[in-house]
Amino acid sequence: MAKPRSAAAAAAAAAKAPAAAPPKTVHSALVTYASMLSLLSLCPPFVILLWYTMVHADGSVVRAYEHLREHGVLEGLKAIWPMPTMVAWKIIFGFGLFEAALQLLLPGKRFEGPVSPSGNVPVYKANGLQAYAVTLITYLSLWWFGIFNPAIVYDHLGEIYSALVFGSFVFCIFLYIKGHLAPSSSDSGSSGNVIIDFYWGMELYPRIGKHFDIKVFTNCRFGMMSWAVLAVTYCIKQYEMNGRVADSMLVNTALMLIYVTKFFWWESGYWCTMDIAHDRAGFYICWGCLVWVPSIYTSPGMYLVNHPVNLGPQLALSILLAGILCIYINYDCDRQRQEFRRTNGKCSIWGKAPSKFLPYFYVIFLTILLFDRAKRDDDRCSSKYGKYWKMYCNKVPCRD
């Protein structure tokens, strides 16, 4: 990848560059519109239905289905859909304003993202890890000193999700209007279709003023931060209810916090990924991070609050270690990809520069041999048993 230009050079290039081309669709118009309209209409009620199932139906899909069948889909959803309350709005705006203030005020190193399609170089302030630490310390301190009880968040969770569903939809309308009337850079443009523009977004790097990056706020400081805060909330709520926290909840919370910590440790790397450098700020990214992440990603803990599972020390430790290993693999894959880009491919593999493939010939040969042997075995069985082999394959699709 080309070395990023300076911000001044990028600004000059952006002034001359035409507006970025709108995002292209890879499917037919029918599939594109059907999929977008389906997600726009089905995701909001699914969030509420998931909350109801986890909290009020003991996680039973059958009970949730019976409720909808008894009352009808629309009336059933209307009956379980909580109305946003003032408490819910206060929690959302309090959290959002706190995170926005941290994003703007905390110190951080200057980070330049990859060159955009229009030649712009987005500039960020890398203070995510500091904001994450301040958020958790503040949240736990408010609980510890009796200033705010996080259990209130769980008690009003349905109302919070309902407010987020509607509020985030309005926010996406704001982004659509802003993209038309006041884009932040030349990396913006319209496809000419309202549905596509609203769903995918108008701007790649929308900002309020010069320094407040909207996608960093929605994706990182609200979405990912709320994941960690809600994980802690569920833990505290279970402790308040039972006087103890089940080992299953401890493992769940620990793994979520480790993952989110990894995310903020690596936040500047995330700014080089598809979510930030390719996907525009629309319903898909912004509504997803504002609503989908805090509701769907935290749902295991949401269920465990009222349904503690006692794993036992050995199983709990095994799950914890396996989870940590998976998180490390995920992190190292991202790290290697970023390192490869940073060095323009001139990086080491297992401490050495990649040079020769012949020492790996045995692995390559054995892979080809095993695939060939599996195919020949399959052909022989098909020839020998005819239609009965096909019946067997249909019943046992995964065979050794």
What are these regions (language model features)?
Residues 2-400:
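Membrane-anchoring alpha-helices and their flanking helix-loop junctions
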